[in-house]
Amino acid sequence: MRIVFIGPPGAGKGTQCELLSKALKVPHIGTGGMLRALEPESGEQIHLRIDRGHFAPDDFVLQMVAERLSQPDSRTGYLLDGFPRTQVQASAFDKQLVAASLKLDHVLHLQVSADVLIERLRKRGETENRADDSEEFIRERFRIYEDRTAPLLDHYRCQGLVRDIDASDSESLVHASICECLNFTLASPAES
């Protein structure tokens, strides 16, 4: 299964991808983590952009994702978290899929109220010490999401791929909603 997760910062994309990855036995490919893991000398400018709440350049992300998707564990499917984030990335990814005779199965849109998101991001910033979760950057990240990523929903709705998920509940309830949406029966996360 090939699934893209779209949602604002703090919606739980990474958490839900991890849970679903174990169940489906496909890799969770999170571009945010991949970008944060770049060596400082090779990714200094990228880190500065991310620390300011901005996206990495499209061409850089497209190359990074293409390299990751070429690995053997991605052949049967994958869960994309943080990609695509822009119309340029989505259009280029569509072309890559067509060239490989592949298609996306779903785009899961994790929806959460602004109040819930702000609280989640504040807590995550305290526990994970992520510069991009500091209160100073939260609103800027929301603005960027609304301007550049949210419009991708229309792109994928036209393809009939978007499934809206209420992600304001607990981790386990959101996971159950995703499984129901995918018509997929799973053991609870505690059992896996």
From Swiss-Prot:
It catalyses: AMP + ATP = 2 ADP. Keywords: ATP-binding, Cytoplasm, Kinase, Nucleotide biosynthesis, Nucleotide-binding, Transferase. Residues 30-56 are annotated as: NMP. GO terms for cellular component: cytoplasm; cytosol. Residues 123-133 are annotated as: LID. AMP binds at T31, R36, G82, F83, P84, R85, Q89, R130, R141. ATP binds at G10, A11, G12, K13, G14, T15, R124, D169. GO terms for molecular function: adenylate kinase activity; ATP binding; nucleoside diphosphate kinase activity. HAMAP family: Adenylate_kinase_Adk. Catalyzes the reversible transfer of the terminal phosphate group between ATP and AMP. Plays an important role in cellular energy homeostasis and in adenine nucleotide metabolism. PANTHER family: NUCLEOTIDE KINASE. This is Adenylate kinase. It comes from Rhodopirellula baltica (strain DSM 10527 / NCIMB 13988 / SH1). The lineage of its organism: Bacteria, Pseudomonadati, Planctomycetota, Planctomycetia, Pirellulales.
